[in-house]
A protein has these predicted regions:
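Hydrophobic/aromatic ligand-binding patch that stacks against planar heteroaromatic rings
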Residues: 28, 54, 138, 158-159
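Conserved nucleotide-binding/hydrolysis micro-motifs of P-loop NTPases
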Residues: 42-45, 79-80, 122-123, 154-157, ...
Length: 188
């Protein structure tokens, strides 16, 4: 299955659930035969995560063997955001982000992906690791039938204006304010 027309989604805001919302879309897309790339920025290859464990657990699952299921690939950089790593080399991080983004653009042009999720890309824009011209080039590189999904805090107005779907998540209540630590299987 291929999409006739891909649209642009933005999940942003200070609330929890931006990546989770995008992964829900990914599950639905794969189940309907679409090929999905989840490109995760600011996340270490070695860092354990529930979404990667979930993907590994699906290998060989009868529902995904044959039939109409698509493919789901997770790809991460191997760097942290300077907020979490005060010794991070901003220039090196920017170079890695641009390298990853160029690969995504090339793969989209080659027809590998029906849905591309750029997880935490909004943060890269907000914090000037990627500029608006580079964002525009990425969107322009996307074939018309590819669905693009941008997640992360601080989506710029320019991205919001070109998006077809924009969801801003707000934390109304969160256990972190009561000093309850992030829990395995729920927050990560």
């Amino acid at each position: 299955m291929k999409l006739e027309k891909g649209l642009i989604h933005v999940y942003t805001g200070e609330g929890k659930g931006k990546t989770s919302a995008a992964l829900g879309l990914a599950m639905r897309a794969v189940g309907r035969g679409l090929n999905v790339l989840v490109q995760q920025y600011f996340k270490l290859e070695s860092e354990p995560s529930g979404e990667l464990a979930w993907k590994e657990g699906l290998k060989g699952h009868p529902a995904l063997e044959g039939g109409e299921a698509g493919h789901l690939i997770f790809r991460r950089g191997d760097y942290r955001h300077p907020f979490f790593d005060k010794n991070a080399d901003r220039a090196a991080i920017r170079a890695k982000i641009l390298e990853q983004t160029a690969l995504v653009a090339a793969e989209m042009k080659a027809g590998y992906w029906d849905v591309v999720i750029l997880d935490e890309f909004n943060n890269a824009l907000r914090d000037k690791f990627v500029d608006l011209e580079e964002l525009e080039a990425l969107i322009d590189a996307s074939p018309e039938e590819v669905e693009l999904v941008f997640t992360g805090r601080g989506a710029p107005v320019e991205l919001i204006e070109v998006a077809d779907y924009v969801t801003e998540l707000h934390a109304v209540k969160h256990p972190g304010t009561r000093k309850i630590a992030a829990r395995k299987g729920i927050e990560f």
